[in-house]
Amino acid sequence: MSLNGVAAKSCTCLAVQADGAEITTVEGLAKGGELHPLQEAFWNKHGLQCGFCTPGMILASHELLRTNPDPSEDEIRHALEGNMCRCTGYQNIVRAVKEAAATMKGGAQ
């Protein structure tokens, strides 16, 4: 989840910490029925499989791209290192973040 615009682990956030805060979940990224570029890229690049890690991966990526719109592969991997995925091997997730960054800058990759 995003807590006041900063990525946070919902599993370790107490309700009292979230009281009065602006909270965004992965579902809140989509606007007007259209997927956010990160959601679209995860779909296009097969960055999701079982879906367990997907919300955390997408929200951590969203935070990264908010602060660094053109991250290197190493920067992406560093930003995602707290999120564990047992299905994809991470390469497609990194590709998805790169594609989303390009899309969000107005280009294509």
Residue spans of the language-model regions?
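Signature of N-terminal electron-transfer/Fe-S-associated modules in redox systems
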Residues: 1-109
